[in-house]
């Protein structure tokens, strides 16, 4: 346990449709610390790209909203997912499932507009080939959907500049434990995918 964040627990539980279950969750709040308890229910679906493409057969253009989530990147987070460690990212690639689906959409002849939601830079080199347009939306907040729609429908010209450098791949910015900046980052790089201020 940490004074900043408790260890997250994940319990898998099989439930049958129509049955009632009594679930009890117990927790203890320490003096002078706030308790933060969340309870999520869901299930994982197998990915069937062809079934998705079949549903989109009459669509010329697909707006794909993807990226990563603030549940994956942050500080001192108990994340045990490939590509992430303690809230830090060990690689900067787009998750493989999304990358593969964007490629499948392009191969199916779709025009693809990718709205990328992330709190930091993502290596989007393959997406510059599989997507016809990329809109960086960051984590947009409650009015974000309307703001993105206004851009997509031409009511507003996206005029922002990138506050960070987007690298081509993880090799340009590998996971490191030595925080010396000499020879690293955008200050020493001439071939970033999207440089600072793009």
Positions of PLM-derived features:
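C-terminal non-catalytic regions of proteins with extracellular/luminal or membrane-system context
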Residues: 1-198
